[in-house]
């Protein structure tokens, strides 16, 4: 793991010692080189933990998420160039340092083998994210969004710390591998039920589960482009990863406790999809779309079958790339029209035909059209939920219909129609932007050729 962690840490001195003209080139190039390192972890002999040390290791569940995290840093740096064009060099370097430190803490969270280490890095991701949202957001409401983000995350994760201390006192170890191998069957008592809630609540807030999701649209809407991309693509996946790791240890209690949360996530999936149809703010629509997709992941994880876990991992990777792509496209609109209101950016297809092509592909990926990897993830979850209970087919099928509706609504509102009067001097799409969209879309399409590498434990 150190061969990934140390080069990422070395990006910090590189950023601060780079010349004014070379900041973007140096950081983008080196982070792109670093993003190839997780490819080494894919070639593992078997499904056991591939340990390089006692503290950090990777396995088939961790590796796809590490790859996603590493791949996203150069993309966020590329996307932020226009946003920071008027900032002095010291501020640019500080912004990049925040992104790099966030990447370091994410890599360490995904690869930590000790649960207390996992908890520390899980909380550490909060600091750079909060700084990015509250310092570099566009509107004054960003402070309110930062408060929501901090409050929800901290309140959700304090019970997790108490549960971890309790487990350590009882069992004497918090090593994930040891706990998985030596876990006792937990009986269905009040104390154990509360412990299960304490363990999973932090991750349900992070996913977020419907009802605990109010911080997400606020944070997404107020965050700068890099904040939105990292938040949608990787930070939400921390919740899914934590749930997959810990619900296995807490079995068979998970099977008893899962029912209310399964019902809530299935209900929330339809509710948030329906909310998307009524949105006027483009970033808010994409944020609610994220909640809807992650509700499907919660459902898959709580069903607790190998196939559902596979579907959850594939869906997390697919959603990470798709939602990040949609935020990039929304940002390219915002940089030209200076508004997030969809109706004010209508008719852009006539001015930016290539950007309209990326919008079409992103919308189709969002509604899980073949040959994207999204389809495979949704089908796996759909089949699993159907085998768990036949009635879920009605809910998931209805959700897929609404997803198709709001994806097409988003595309038609922003691209079709007559141009508004305030758009008089529109800059053409830059090579940087087109490269950015291509780098998001190519993994979505290429992974469908060999989805084996991101199917998690069950490959």
From Swiss-Prot:
Keywords: Electron transport, Membrane, Mitochondrion, Mitochondrion inner membrane, NAD, Respiratory chain, Translocase, Transmembrane, Transmembrane helix, Transport, Ubiquinone. It catalyses: a ubiquinone + NADH + 5 H(+)(in) = a ubiquinol + NAD(+) + 4 H(+)(out). Its main location: mitochondrion. It comes from Pan paniscus (Pygmy chimpanzee). It is found in: Mitochondrion inner membrane. It is a multi-pass membrane protein. One of its GO terms (molecular function) is NADH dehydrogenase (ubiquinone) activity. Core subunit of the mitochondrial membrane respiratory chain NADH dehydrogenase (Complex I) which catalyzes electron transfer from NADH through the respiratory chain, using ubiquinone as an electron acceptor. Essential for the catalytic activity and assembly of complex I. Belongs to the complex I subunit 4 family. It comes from the Eukaryota. The gene is MT-ND4. PANTHER family: NADH-UBIQUINONE OXIDOREDUCTASE CHAIN 4 (PTHR43507:SF20). The chain crosses the membrane at residues 22-42, 60-80, 94-112, 113-133, 145-165, 196-216, 224-244, 257-277, 284-303, 308-330, 351-371, 391-411. This is NADH-ubiquinone oxidoreductase chain 4.
């Amino acid at each position: 793991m150190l061969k990934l962690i140390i080069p990422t840490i070395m990006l910090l001195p590189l950023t601060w010692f780079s010349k004014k003209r070379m900041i973007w080139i140096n950081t983008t190039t080196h982070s792109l080189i670093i993003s190839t390192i997780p490819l080494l972890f894919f070639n593992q002999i078997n499904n056991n933990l591939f340990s390089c040390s006692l503290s950090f290791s990777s396995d088939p569940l961790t590796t796809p998420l590490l790859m996603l995290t590493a791949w996203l840093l150069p993309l966020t740096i590329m996307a932020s160039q226009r946003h920071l064009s008027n900032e002095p060099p010291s501020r640019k370097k500080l912004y990049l340092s925040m992104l790099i430190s966030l990447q370091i803490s994410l890599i360490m969270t995904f690869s930590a083998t000790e649960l207390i280490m996992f908890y520390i890095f899980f909380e550490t991701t909060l600091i750079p994210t909060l700084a990015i949202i509250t310092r570099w957001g566009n509107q004054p409401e960003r402070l309110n969004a930062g408060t929501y983000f901090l409050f929800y995350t901290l309140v959700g994760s304090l019970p997790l710390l108490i549960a971890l201390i309790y487990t350590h006192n009882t069992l004497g170890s918090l090593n994930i591998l040891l706990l998985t191998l030596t876990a006792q069957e937990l009986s269905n008592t009040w104390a154990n039920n509360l412990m299960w809630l304490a363990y999973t609540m932090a991750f349900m807030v992070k996913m977020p589960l419907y009802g605990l999701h109010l911080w997400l649209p606020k944070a997404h809407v107020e965050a700068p482009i890099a904040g939105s991309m990292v938040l949608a693509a990787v930070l939400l996946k921390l919740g899914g990863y934590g749930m997959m790791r810990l619900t296995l240890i807490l079995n068979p209690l998970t099977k008893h406790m899962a029912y209310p949360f399964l019902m809530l996530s299935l209900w929330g999936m339809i509710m948030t999809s329906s909310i998307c149809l009524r949105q006027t703010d483009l970033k808010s629509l994409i944020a609610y779309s994220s909640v809807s997709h992650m509700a499907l992941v919660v459902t898959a994880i709580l069903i607790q079958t190998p196939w559902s876990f596979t579907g959850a991992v594939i869906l997390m990777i697919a959603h990470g790339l798709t939602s990040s792509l949609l935020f990039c496209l929304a940002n390219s609109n915002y940089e030209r029209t200076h508004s997030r209101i969809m109706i004010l950016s209508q008719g852009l297809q006539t001015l930016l035909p290539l950007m309209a092509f990326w919008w079409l592909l992103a919308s189709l990926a969002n509604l899980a059209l073949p040959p994207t990897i999204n389809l495979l993830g949704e089908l796996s979850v759909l089949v699993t939920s159907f085998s768990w209970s036949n009635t879920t087919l009605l809910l998931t099928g209805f959700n897929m219909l609404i997803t198709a509706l709001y994806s097409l609504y988003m595309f038609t509102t922003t691209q079709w129609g007559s141009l508004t009067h305030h758009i008089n001097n529109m800059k053409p799409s830059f090579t940087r932007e087109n490269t950015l969209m291509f780098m998001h879309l190519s993994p979505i399409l290429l992974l469908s050729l060999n989805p084996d590498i991101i199917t998690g434990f069950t490959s």
